[in-house]
Each structure stands twice: as structure tokens, then as C-alpha cells.
Amino acid sequence: MYMDLEGRKCLVVGAGAVAARKVRALLECGARVTVVGEDPVPALQRLESESLTIRARKFRRSDMGRYSLVVGATDDSVVNRTVSRESRKRGIPVNIVDVPEESTFIVPAVHRRGDLAIAVSTGGKSPAAARRIREELEERYGGDYAVMIALLGAHREEMMTAVPGHRRRAAAWKGILDAGLLGVLRKKGRPAGAALIRRHIRAAAEGEGV
């Protein structure tokens, strides 16, 4: 499940290194983040943003407000359970880091390249394994994949307008990928890739193959 957090209020309880990573990820999603925790680590303090509020103190039940999402990232199991309980009472999705039984959702390890996002989850069984797999994916799916996704997206409206029917469009997209779009981009660049896409769109619009 993907949640659109653009402009939404999120709460992170905890101010350590793990909390800093969670805050950074939320800010990258466009969320407005409030952090509550004692002794914020430097990595957290360096995350300067108009969308970030840091309250350097202990968590209080009164900190629970109208949030779209809550993350508990403290090393205090009592605080984490309180965060989980108070979030559930209010119907707010909550993730307690590395404690799936106290969470209503699990945050996967995510590999991002532009608009490409690949999520890896072990169901909370082994976050370390999920991170290792994500690192392997980072080596395989580099920036050229982001270029390809952006180029496909740039021609999506043209495909929707020119080619009638979901099946014909799906077949056309498959044909573009099968024709080696990624290889064309690597060897000849974006203009050649765009030309390949347009050829397939024209052929699909005319009911022909390439």
C-alpha cells in the first residue's frame, strides 16, 4: 500500500538515529513532520525544513493530535506501547519500529530512482534482511531506470489519446519494453528512446505491430 503524504501531518516519537531516518523519509514524501523526543541527534537537527517541528522533550499523551500517520522510534518499550495504544484509539495508522505486533502497518525498505520505487518487506521478521536486499537492488536498478520511467511517463498521455482500448495500450507498452528501450537509452540516449516509443504508438494506433 502506498499513502500520499504530501502536506499531511505526521508524528515521530523518538529523536535518535532511527527516528532521523524515518523523519528524512517522511519529509521526502512531502509530509509535515512533528518530532517529540529528548536529546535529538545531530542527524535529526540537520534536517532543516519548514515542514519539520522538533519538540526536544519526553512524549506526552497530549502530543497525540490529528495526524495522518504516527511512528514510534524510541528505545523505551513502555513509551512505544503507549504510542501504539493511543494511535489505535484514534484510528491513526501507527508503526512501532521493529515491533510489528504493536504496529498497524509495516514500513518496507524502499529503493528509489526518480519515480521508480521498489519496496522490500519481510513482514517485520527481519528488517536487516530487507535492507540488504534493497542494497542489492540499488546496484542493479540505477539511474538509467529512472530515465526510462520518466520517458515512458512523458508519452503516457500520447498513448492514451492515440491508442484505443486497454488491451491494445498494454500490448503497445509491452512491445516498447520488449524492443529494448532501456538498451537504446543506454547506447543512443533519450532522443532515440523517444523515437522508439513514438514508432510503437503510431503502429498501435493503426492496429499494426512494429
Put a short name on every predicted segment:
Residues 1-39, 44-47:
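Hydrophobic, well-ordered beta-alpha structural blocks that scaffold small-molecule cofactor pockets
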Residues 124-210:
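An accessory alpha-helical subdomain
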Residues 48-65:
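Glycine-rich, highly charged phosphate/nucleotide-binding loops
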Residues 33, 54, 93-94:
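Hydrophobic beta-strand scaffold residues
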